[in-house]
């Protein structure tokens, strides 16, 4: 009986920790903006967003549990391609996109609305100087602040959502502002990068659960799986509420307003100036804790990749300097620059997640073939989306849903499975499942 009680408690504790990892304060800007753009179709747009965000992130978590490590998921494509893909993932959830976004979000939601004279360059220098000090010292204060801020942020968000449902700021517009809410929702889900983060986050959670005494794979699956579902339900409630709030102002605002500005306008309309200040402060502090976690994780990964030849502290400094420069692009420009990169690396990553989850014993050559098909298609679609005329691309199946890479991935994977026996004989590895009985 005591054991069950402890298991339930651990599921709740780990679930809340996972929520805070996936949510990240920077992700608060995407659902309201999608809701505003989708207007009367906000629920359809949100459904696509949630599937591409938390749905895929949960699949990534379960795939990790299925095969036992992120290396087992990624290494199917071969050592060098796997390292390149993992580097791309870490760069996206690190210094290229996610870390600079924490600074830009803090400036636009906490500083700019209340202290209009502050230079964004000066702020970014101060912000990352703080991150640098806390990451190098690995201060325990960060953990304490994070545990306090996550519940505060959650309470603040639910207070705003409930008030916005009871007394909406405005009426939902008659027509959407965008032509394809499903594709826009999927791309907004990609921007959160939660599915990419599921692999490194999953390792952290798995290590935490193991440290709590769950050394049996079935028990680990139960605790981590329960925690992932709890985090998913919390994120569903928060993101859906925020998307609805965005829809309620779809008659007042359009794409000319920035993402952070839209959130703060909604908060001010619902909670007043004082509420806007308090919300901005909480979001800003939460961004600090997110930046610390991402910076330390990215620095640790690259230090390990270099096998200690370049120390952890050197990577922390490099990441902070680079992120400070990128953060001055501003939140919306960071999102715009990140979009094509994410559109390219998401499909092959998702292919590996699907294979690890559903067909973990599939030979590596098939995984490589499927990833090549997904990668080629995603590159062509991204080029088309940015003005390059490739006539065949819009005719691809599922193109209108943003999933045109699915069938090419399956075709290339099937073709790889039909390779001659000599090529097959060079296969060296089939990933053993950690929960198999021996």
Predicted segments — roles?
Residues 13-23, 161-169, 178-245, 278-287, ...:
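Hydrophobic, membrane-embedded alpha-helices of multi-pass small-molecule transporters
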Residues 36, 65-72, 128-149, 211-214, ...:
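Membrane-water interface regions at transmembrane-helix termini and the short interhelical loops
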Residues 55, 59, 152-163, 226-250, ...:
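Selective recognition of specific alpha-helical transmembrane segments in multi-pass small-molecule
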Residues 350-414, 425-438:
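C-terminal membrane-solvent junction of multi-pass transporters and transport-like membrane proteins
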Residues 34, 102-119, 210-211, 291-318:
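Helix-loop-helix connectors at the membrane interface of multi-pass transporters/channels
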């Amino acid at each position: 009986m005591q054991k069950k009680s402890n298991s339930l408690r651990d599921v709740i504790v780990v679930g809340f920790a996972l929520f805070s990892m996936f949510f990240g304060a920077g992700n608060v800007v995407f659902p309201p903006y999608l809701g505003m753009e989708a207007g009367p179709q906000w629920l359809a747009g949100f459904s696509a967003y949630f599937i591409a965000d938390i749905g895929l992130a949960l699949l990534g978590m379960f795939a990790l549990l299925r095969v036992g490590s992120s290396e087992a998921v990624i290494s199917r494509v071969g050592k060098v391609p796997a390292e390149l893909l993992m580097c791309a993932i870490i760069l996206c959830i690190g210094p290229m996109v996610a870390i600079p976004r924490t600074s830009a979000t803090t400036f636009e939601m906490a500083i700019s609305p209340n202290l209009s004279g502050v230079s964004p360059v000066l702020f970014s220098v101060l912000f990352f100087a703080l991150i640098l000090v806390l990451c190098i010292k690995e201060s325990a204060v960060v953990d304490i602040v994070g545990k306090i801020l996550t519940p505060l942020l959650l309470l603040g968000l639910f207070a705003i959502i409930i008030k916005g449902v009871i007394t909406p700021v405005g009426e939902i517009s008659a027509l959407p502002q965008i032509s394809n809410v499903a594709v826009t929702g999927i791309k907004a889900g990609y921007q959160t990068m939660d599915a990419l983060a599921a692999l490194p986050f999953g390792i952290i959670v798995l290590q935490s659960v193991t440290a709590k005494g769950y050394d049996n794979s079935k028990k680990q699956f139960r605790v981590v799986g329960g925690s992932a579902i709890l985090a998913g339900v919390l994120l569903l409630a928060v993101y859906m509420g925020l998307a609805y709030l965005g829809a309620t102002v779809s008659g007042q605002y359009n794409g000319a307003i920035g993402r952070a500005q839209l959130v703060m306008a909604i908060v001010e309309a619902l909670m007043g100036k004082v509420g806007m200040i308090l919300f901005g402060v909480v979001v800003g502090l939460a961004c600090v804790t997110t930046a610390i976690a991402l910076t330390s994780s990215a620095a640790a990964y690259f230090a390990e990749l270099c096998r200690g030849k370049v120390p952890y502290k050197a990577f922390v400094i490099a990441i902070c300097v680079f992120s400070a420069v990128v953060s001055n692009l501003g939140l919306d420009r960071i999102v715009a620059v990140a979009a094509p990169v994410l559109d390219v690396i998401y499909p092959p990553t998702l292919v590996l997640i699907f294979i690890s989850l559903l067909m973990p014993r599939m030979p590596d050559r098939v995984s490589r073939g499927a990833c090549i098909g997904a990668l080629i298609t995603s590159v062509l679609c991204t080029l088309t989306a940015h003005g390059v005329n490739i006539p065949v691309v819009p005719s691809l199946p599922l193109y209108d849903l943003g999933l045109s890479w699915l069938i090419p991935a399956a075709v290339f994977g099937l073709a790889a499975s039909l390779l001659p026996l000599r090529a097959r004989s060079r296969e060296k590895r089939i990933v053993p499942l950690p929960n198999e009985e021996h």
